């Protein structure tokens, strides 16, 4: 049975709808919470069969409000990448993936948007990525994938919404399994919130079925390319 290492950066942001897809395939995962008093960034030995780096709420990586464990997490992601193990980065996690794989980040204010991402590679996620999908983004700063990365999908402004590095490393600016309750908890968890989050919350709530439907092929492609179902 596969075992994944999942790093949280806030109490509110977790795997969300992705949990059911992993559990349904008997893929185990363990949350690590470096932001708690007793929490630390896990050692490489704890990565197991793959690393998932989640979003950071108001935390970023471009220097304005860096997540406190940024250096350690970039080092862990780099070691995981160099070992050939799969990595999934979401939001802040995608920024960490970019930094660990010779990309960069650019400064951007904390934003909360629910827009449509558009696939740009027909074979994205082994052909399973939907042609378009709802892309809920709650993030400060933005990942800039390395030049050798493959852009899988773009946001309405043309910036990357999803990218792939090598065979089994992926970054998503939005959370493919985001729930309205998670966004509400992020708003309540921190003093700093995106401006006027109400409309985005409503839009996220109305899109819940579309998000759940798109997640089915997205997870199918991720699991296939990461090999998490192979013995």
Which stretches of residues belong to each language-model region?
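Catalytic nucleophile loop
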Residues: 79-104
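Pocket-forming structural segment of enzyme catalytic cores
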Residues: 99-181
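Cofactor-binding loop segments of dinucleotide-utilizing enzymes, especially the Rossmann-like FAD-
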Residues: 7-9, 34, 92, 174
